[in-house]
Regions:
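Active-site residues of response regulator receiver
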Residues: 11, 55
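Charged docking surfaces used in two-component/phosphorelay signaling
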Residues: 18-26
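Helix N-cap/capping motif at the beta->alpha junctions
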Residues: 33-42, 63
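Short amphipathic alpha-helix used as the core "switch/output" element in two-component signaling
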Residues: 42, 64-77
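Active-site beta3 strand of CheY-like receiver
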Residues: 47-53
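Receiver (REC) domain active-site loop signature in two-component systems and cognate sites
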Residues: 58
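Alpha4 helix (beta4-alpha4-beta5 surface) of REC/receiver domains from two-component response regulators
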Residues: 65, 88-106, 112-113, 117
Length: 134
Protein backbone atom coordinates (compact mmCIF):
# COMPACT_ATOMS: atom_id res chain seq x y z
CA UNK A 1 0.00 0.00 0.00
CA UNK A 2 1.35 3.39 -0.99
CA UNK A 3 1.50 6.25 1.49
CA UNK A 4 -0.67 9.14 0.30
CA UNK A 5 1.10 12.36 -0.62
CA UNK A 6 0.98 15.02 2.11
CA UNK A 7 -0.36 18.41 1.09
CA UNK A 8 -0.17 21.53 3.26
CA UNK A 9 -2.63 24.35 2.55
CA UNK A 10 -1.83 27.74 4.11
CA UNK A 11 -4.55 30.38 3.79
CA UNK A 12 -6.22 32.81 6.18
CA UNK A 13 -9.61 32.20 4.51
CA UNK A 14 -11.37 29.33 6.29
CA UNK A 15 -13.64 28.69 3.30
CA UNK A 16 -10.64 28.22 1.01
CA UNK A 17 -8.98 25.91 3.55
CA UNK A 18 -12.07 23.74 3.91
CA UNK A 19 -12.91 23.64 0.20
CA UNK A 20 -9.39 22.81 -0.98
CA UNK A 21 -8.84 20.32 1.86
CA UNK A 22 -12.07 18.44 1.15
CA UNK A 23 -11.38 18.26 -2.59
CA UNK A 24 -7.83 17.00 -2.11
CA UNK A 25 -8.84 14.54 0.62
CA UNK A 26 -11.39 13.04 -1.78
CA UNK A 27 -8.52 12.55 -4.23
CA UNK A 28 -6.72 10.46 -1.62
CA UNK A 29 -4.19 13.00 -0.36
CA UNK A 30 -3.31 13.49 3.30
CA UNK A 31 -4.16 17.15 3.84
CA UNK A 32 -3.07 19.51 6.61
CA UNK A 33 -4.26 23.09 6.85
CA UNK A 34 -2.93 26.21 8.52
CA UNK A 35 -4.80 29.49 8.91
CA UNK A 36 -1.59 31.52 9.23
CA UNK A 37 1.93 31.37 7.81
CA UNK A 38 3.49 30.85 11.24
CA UNK A 39 1.27 27.84 11.94
CA UNK A 40 2.02 26.64 8.41
CA UNK A 41 5.76 26.75 9.04
CA UNK A 42 5.30 24.78 12.25
CA UNK A 43 3.21 22.20 10.35
CA UNK A 44 5.88 21.96 7.62
CA UNK A 45 8.56 21.22 10.22
CA UNK A 46 6.47 18.73 12.22
CA UNK A 47 4.96 16.88 9.24
CA UNK A 48 6.97 17.67 6.09
CA UNK A 49 4.58 18.07 3.16
CA UNK A 50 5.14 16.79 -0.35
CA UNK A 51 3.61 19.99 -1.75
CA UNK A 52 2.24 23.29 -0.43
CA UNK A 53 -0.64 25.48 -1.62
CA UNK A 54 0.00 28.95 -0.21
CA UNK A 55 -2.05 32.14 -0.17
CA UNK A 56 -0.13 35.31 -1.03
CA UNK A 57 -2.03 37.89 1.03
CA UNK A 58 -2.21 37.07 4.74
CA UNK A 59 -1.84 39.18 7.88
CA UNK A 60 1.52 39.60 9.63
CA UNK A 61 3.57 37.39 7.27
CA UNK A 62 2.57 37.11 3.62
CA UNK A 63 3.10 34.11 1.37
CA UNK A 64 6.48 35.39 0.20
CA UNK A 65 7.68 35.75 3.80
CA UNK A 66 6.51 32.20 4.48
CA UNK A 67 8.38 30.99 1.41
CA UNK A 68 11.64 32.71 2.42
CA UNK A 69 11.45 31.08 5.85
CA UNK A 70 10.56 27.71 4.33
CA UNK A 71 13.40 27.80 1.79
CA UNK A 72 15.88 28.65 4.58
CA UNK A 73 15.36 25.12 5.88
CA UNK A 74 17.48 22.59 3.98
CA UNK A 75 14.74 19.96 4.02
CA UNK A 76 12.34 22.36 2.27
CA UNK A 77 14.61 24.01 -0.28
CA UNK A 78 12.84 22.18 -3.10
CA UNK A 79 9.41 21.39 -1.67
CA UNK A 80 7.00 22.23 -4.51
CA UNK A 81 4.94 25.33 -3.69
CA UNK A 82 2.13 27.14 -5.49
CA UNK A 83 1.35 30.67 -4.41
CA UNK A 84 -2.32 31.35 -4.99
CA UNK A 85 -3.49 34.95 -5.07
CA UNK A 86 -6.72 36.82 -5.61
CA UNK A 87 -4.71 39.73 -7.01
CA UNK A 88 -5.10 39.68 -10.76
CA UNK A 89 -2.00 41.76 -11.43
CA UNK A 90 1.18 39.84 -12.19
CA UNK A 91 3.12 43.06 -11.49
CA UNK A 92 2.18 42.89 -7.80
CA UNK A 93 5.22 43.99 -5.72
CA UNK A 94 4.93 40.93 -3.47
CA UNK A 95 5.17 38.64 -6.49
CA UNK A 96 8.31 40.37 -7.71
CA UNK A 97 10.04 39.15 -4.53
CA UNK A 98 9.64 35.53 -5.67
CA UNK A 99 12.74 35.57 -7.85
CA UNK A 100 14.71 32.40 -7.17
CA UNK A 101 12.24 30.95 -4.66
CA UNK A 102 10.89 28.18 -6.91
CA UNK A 103 7.13 28.69 -6.75
CA UNK A 104 4.24 28.46 -9.17
CA UNK A 105 1.91 31.47 -9.21
CA UNK A 106 -1.82 30.86 -9.69
CA UNK A 107 -4.80 33.16 -9.52
CA UNK A 108 -8.09 32.88 -7.63
CA UNK A 109 -10.79 32.03 -8.18
CA UNK A 110 -9.83 28.44 -8.94
CA UNK A 111 -12.19 25.62 -9.81
CA UNK A 112 -11.80 22.43 -7.81
CA UNK A 113 -10.50 20.53 -10.84
CA UNK A 114 -7.84 23.23 -11.26
CA UNK A 115 -6.75 22.78 -7.63
CA UNK A 116 -6.48 19.02 -8.14
CA UNK A 117 -4.53 19.45 -11.40
CA UNK A 118 -2.23 22.01 -9.77
CA UNK A 119 -1.55 19.61 -6.90
CA UNK A 120 -0.70 16.79 -9.30
CA UNK A 121 1.64 19.13 -11.19
CA UNK A 122 3.40 20.13 -7.96
CA UNK A 123 3.79 16.51 -6.88
CA UNK A 124 5.34 15.64 -10.24
CA UNK A 125 8.07 18.20 -9.47
CA UNK A 126 9.13 16.59 -6.19
CA UNK A 127 12.82 15.94 -5.74
CA UNK A 128 14.18 13.28 -3.43
CA UNK A 129 15.75 14.68 -0.27
CA UNK A 130 19.50 14.20 -0.13
CA UNK A 131 20.10 12.41 3.21
CA UNK A 132 23.48 14.14 3.54
CA UNK A 133 21.75 17.54 3.66
CA UNK A 134 18.98 16.74 6.12
Amino acid sequence: MTTPARILIVDDDETVLQTFAKALSLEGYEVRTAASPLIGLQEAVETPPDAILLDLRMPFVNGVGFLYRLRAQVAHRHTPVAIITGDSCIDDPALSELHGLEAEVCFKPMWIDEVVTLTRTLLAKRRPIDPLLS
